[in-house]
Design a protein with these regions (language model features):
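An active-site metal/cofactor-coordinating segment within enzyme catalytic domains
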Residues: 1-55
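Short loop-to-alpha-helix "cap/lid" segments that border enzyme active sites
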Residues: 57-58, 63-202
Length: 202
């Protein structure tokens, strides 16, 4: 199944560890986002989720620390013809395992420096590089610009600031826009999309 957490508590109306439940049990519960319940919407299998996204959006598949079988996951991505659409996010060793299976599978490393990103240059499908908000906002405000100067696509997320955006506070989003980052991850794409359109950025 497709589940970010070890439990279903945060993203469904149920409770329990994924590892201690079968899929039929998990299907008893509806999906939710914060307190918003999507009645009738169920936890998908990875195949179902990828097929729903195929040809429409890029998929950020976060498998860091989740013991996902590399060969099985790679085979599914290949079978569905989505090697150019699914971006694997994990630790370096696991990312390179995917590269050894299929160099066309997009890998999505987390980096702490431009030099970290340069170490992936031999892998053409290393396209998008994630960095922390701390890196940009405190340590190096021009980090995204430095990454772009090397030809990399810098990316970060503002998941910790979603609650602020929901009440009209866009300070964190404004700082990311100013950083010239190429991608911003959020659980509230409709809010970010509307804000970017209002500013003439989409």
């Amino acid at each position: 199944i497709l589940m970010h957490d070890e439990t279903i508590d945060r993203t469904t109306t149920g409770k329990g560890k994924v590892s201690s439940m079968n899929y039929a049990e998990i299907l008893k519960y509806d999906l939710k986002r914060s307190t918003e319940v999507s009645e009738g919407m169920k936890v998908p299998t990875m195949r179902e989720a990828l097929l729903a996204c195929k040809g429409k959006v890029y998929v950020n598949l976060d498998i860091a620390g989740k013991s996902v079988p590399v060969a099985k996951c790679a085979a599914l991505i290949q079978e569905l013809g989505m090697t150019d659409q699914v971006m694997i996010y994990s630790g370096k060793d696991e990312l390179l395992d995917y590269q050894s299976i299929d160099p066309n599978i997009i890998i999505h490393p987390f980096v702490h420096s431009v030099q970290d990103a340069i170490s992936y240059r031999q892998y053409p499908s290393a396209l998008l590089f994630q960095y922390s908000y701390q890196k940009y906002d405190v340590e190096n405000p021009v980090f995204a610009k430095e990454m772009r100067a090397e030809g990399f696509l810098p990316y970060s997320n503002i998941l910790d600031f979603d609650a602020q955006m929901k009440v009209g506070n866009y300070a964190a989003l404004d700082r990311f826009i100013a950083s010239e980052t190429d991608f911003i991850q959020t659980d509230y794409v409709e809010i970010v999309d509307a804000y970017l359109k209002d500013r003439g950025l989409r």
